[in-house]
Amino acid sequence: MSEPVTLSFARLTAAPKGVLIVLTDETLAFGAQTQKLLKGADAAITRAFDAERYKGKAWSTIDLLAPAGLDAPRLVVISVGKAGELKPADFLKLGGVAAGKIPSSAREATVVLDLPGAKIGPESAAEVALGIRLRTYSFDRYKTKKKDDTERGALAMTLLVSDEAGTKRAATTADAVGDGVLFARDLVNEPANVLDPPEFARRAEEHLSSVGVEIEVLDDAGLARAGMHTLLGVGQGSIKESRVVIMRWNGGPAGEPPVAFIGKGVTFDTGGISIKPAAGMEDMKGDMGGAACVTGLMYALAARKAKVNAVGLIGLVENMPDGAAQRPGDIVTSLSGQTIEIINTDAEGRLVLCDVLWYAKEQFKPKFMIDLATLTGAILVALGSEYAGLFSNDDTLSERLTKTGQETGERVWRMPLGPEYDKLVDSKFADMKNTGGRHAGSITAAQFLQRFVDKTPWAHLDIAGTAMSSPASDINKSWGSGWGVRLLNQLVKDHYEG
């Protein structure tokens, strides 16, 4: 990954350097310190506002080049709209908007976090810094030539804040979360010829062990001994071995049940024998977005020393067609003992998840399980790329995820589950089949998974529309988004830390 920006914090009264970015609201008012900084440029700013008919609509901006009366090469004014109604996601967005307004030629910039009638506290300021990091990330590992006219050189950004010491402390936590998001993005962006299941497992072990996460890796032989034959069936057509990575962070009281996160990690999905169309198949390198999120989340929890016991499990396979590949019509026995008829080998994600869910439930007896998977195209049809689909057997967990999603900007929308959908996944020859037909595709996938959680509180997040290839946003210009790391980190922080 590439992060060409160095961030620092200084007191609000410090002298700005380079491009100057200030904030206003819907009334076009400035904070007290900003007014002092801009005093000599009042006339130039007023003329610019009038000339552009600038009204201060939320997230609108105006640029002034070398304004008279101000010792800055460029002044950028950003309106936050209603200053008293900003949520954490808004401060994150503010950082992204600010970073996006700095020309690639700039080497220094200052953001003055000062608003009229609303103090920007340490945690909010740290969110702004995180937004800058997320916006300026790029994945250019395989580019041998740089576009000098568009790619940024080194940039030093200073955030002027009301509480310098407090912001630096808050930024330490935010940086841990940011590191988790960017690690997840790196994993999703990697090509599948580089990031196969063994390599994914190796990177997870190397990266997470550095922050105190305990790692256990099950290879093909270990998976067979454990009884994960459904997961192994998905990968049997590939020359690459499958893996399950178990990540434990013990930050809570000894003996307290952990919270559990499970990720689908199909490092490349051809569809298997039920092969996908060629168009767009290259994007199937990202079919491990759920596993990337869980890995990034576990890193974030450990790096910020979260006071919780947490376990993350990821099932890593490659779904390929060859003479040994699983066939439509095959019947496999899952770790739970339930049998599954394979109707479509391209409905493989649920086959990976079902064994890992059962393993997590039986081995760890968790407080809850949340699985994440780029599971169905149907959820993209239903919700687009703005929301992830949420399916749950527990109203409290569902409500917490929904509220946290609104606060963080990683939003979820609850979808139905019910016994009336069971008949769509019942099989004539086995306990169930792995597809339920064209109708209610996301629901039947979740209904299938629900058979492997028993009474454990559980939520399934279908992130097919949010994990990769989403439209560029103020905080992400990358193909892989790292979606879910911030959501689940905040869920743990708000509700499950001691």
UniProtKB/Swiss-Prot annotation:
Cofactor info, note text: Binds 2 manganese ions per subunit.
CDD domains: Peptidase_M17
Alphabetized NCBIfam families for the sequence: PRK00913.1-2, PRK00913.1-4, PRK00913.2-2, PRK00913.2-4
Cofactor(s), names only, from the UniProt record: Mn(2+)
Catalyzed chemical reaction(s): Release of an N-terminal amino acid, Xaa-|-Yaa-, in which Xaa is preferably Leu, but may be other amino acids including Pro although not Arg or Lys, and Yaa may be Pro. Amino acid amides and methyl esters are also readily hydrolyzed, but rates on arylamides are exceedingly low; Release of an N-terminal amino acid, preferentially leucine, but not glutamic or aspartic acids
Binding site for Mn(2+) 1: D269, D346, E348
A GO CC term assigned to this protein in UniProt: cytoplasm
The protein's enzyme class: hydrolase
SUPFAM superfamilies assigned to the protein according to its UniProt record, in alphabetical order: Macro domain-like, Zn-dependent exopeptidases
Main localization, broad class: cytoplasm
GO BP terms in the entry: proteolysis
Catalytic site positions: K276, R350
Stated name of the protein: Probable cytosol aminopeptidase
Pfam families named among the record's database cross-references: Peptidase_M17, Peptidase_M17_N
Binding site for Mn(2+) 2: K264, D269, D287, E348
GO MF terms, alphabetically ordered: manganese ion binding; metalloaminopeptidase activity
The family this protein is said to belong to: Belongs to the peptidase M17 family.
Localization of this protein: Cytoplasm
